[in-house]
């Protein structure tokens, strides 16, 4: 049988299996299980469960997807749908625990170890589905995705999200860890189901056939499903942007909850279930005598969106099965994806040359940073946020960097903040491992608190020394409250920060996510910076309306003081549910008055008629809006609204001084990174979905509303041009350079069909800014042309690293530097993040 015939059949199977049902998510669940295992540490008991799971990856990975095996109609016409449903809930886990304890006492033989590994994978799937599908909880991933991108339709979000998550996983992640064989404990499963139901409900052949289909599908996804990236990216910007990071049901949150259920499962395997509370919903299991009363623990039907599907599976797809006494192994044999990978890579290279050419790098391209800083801990999110300030008061700019995903074994996503001091020549000009060579480190102490998600430097207690505020928005995740906290560390005469927080600010509201963003800005009119805190996910009087609050700096701030959000000196809320008010913050002085700008990128323009008649399709989704306040006044003075659905105006904000047609002008930049634009290639036109755009407004004291001066646009679909904005003077001419990032940009114009992300950062000289469509006036045959108009273009040194996910400028006596974060770089460790330093001078 030819490889081509077999893979044609397998891809056909994949197409029908996933695109017409909602039972997919294989790649997503395998990835969650892989991440959960990375930092697993179960110290109590007689078994080293991490070693057991690492040894039996074949069973563990099969378990992570098993609960969905009997949902799709291709599996025996869907007759065993209810068996899959029951496998998602606590009674199945309880039956499995009792079965193992009654039949296989310690020490376990290898087949029993495989059964245990398989069960751990199943439990990961259980808790992941609860937060992903919002089962018994509010504001899980798909519920929020539906509210923002699908007119509040959960069913549409479900249909796009389950398989879309797999597409995104295969496009963004390397699955080189996937086992080439899987093990399913058939005989043990039959007996567990007998005990659970009290009768026979399924046969050996059904389990074998349906789990083997999952095995085939998983390897089929490895081959080609990433090529559907453009389709699913168009459907949901939320899916692309929040898939890993969303606080309740993002990949990292689901991995955190997997580690929790592993701890409980190991306890029950060794001690029984008598000391445990076992509600129907596995997310609420507890074995410490405490119950979570915050949210409902009732069972909710997981999957009811499957369509009928019947198809013939080609007999050419030969079953590579090896039965044992208690189970069965599935193997790829000679038809593994690796056997045809070379063919696809060669085709991609040849076609990519057609679309991108092989010309020499343009002179304005900067492809090599002067230094790169990394970590050796995976998933750390190094560079999620950065700040620059002279912390040690030596006259040189220093760099402060957040890594909210930083973990230790047994301490998942506690987060870290790193400090790197500058000198006359700027930041260290050599590559660094920040865990070993950073000048200062602060570490979070709450499980999955994501300490380091936001940073602000200010003199909070007005003692003349810089203090550091750090956001940890997921504090309370273990209780499913996600209240969040902000910690303030006081500076000292020695130039060092306190080793523990001097001030803690907390929020009592569930899903408050306090500390998602921080800003140092004057909020009381005394000319000194105050602490501005925001959370776009906070209730704000509804659901995810968002809040922004300010705490004034003053010398009466006591050491070890605890504050709550209710004690804020100034506070405003968002207007609409899921409008994400406070997603971005920016402070600027206009005519000696402090203007606070607040972005609300998912704001909708809901007409009164649509609101009264509940006609959701009359809304324009995610237009975005920017609000301007002159604190301490709480009255809104400025409003800038988006005009394109899904454009998300207000995602990013920055301001500075440039020359516009020769006139010195104070300007405001507002990013709309998912704005659609039109590209022209000779006589052809193409819509650049989510290519991104940035508006430049004049900030004139005599005008009540900023006047639109110029626009900039990206040149690739889905590139998120303008998602990060910054203005700073790099050449010491008194004018700010305009810096714009496109972290999801793809080199070729096929938007993922032939290439990977290779984000770019564009630097425009502040001396030569023009009115109108800046990137639309092109000499080349293609528009827009953001590269043609730029003075410098910083090129990502690593594919698929989200180069440009954040950036900051650092000043020293000899040079000015730009630090660009690649938030998903794998240079130091898998998806750990990296910082790239670029130096500029006035010469």
Swiss-Prot record:
SUPFAM superfamilies with a match to the protein in the record: Integrin alpha N-terminal domain
E.C. number: 3.1.4.50
FG-GAP repeat coordinates: 368-429, 435-498, 500-560, 564-625, 635-695, 707-773, 791-843
Post-translational modifications: Glycosylated.
Keyword vocabulary terms for this entry: Glycoprotein, HDL, Hydrolase, Lipid metabolism, Repeat, Secreted, Signal
Subunit (UniProt): Monomer.
Protein name: Phosphatidylinositol-glycan-specific phospholipase D
Organism: Rattus norvegicus
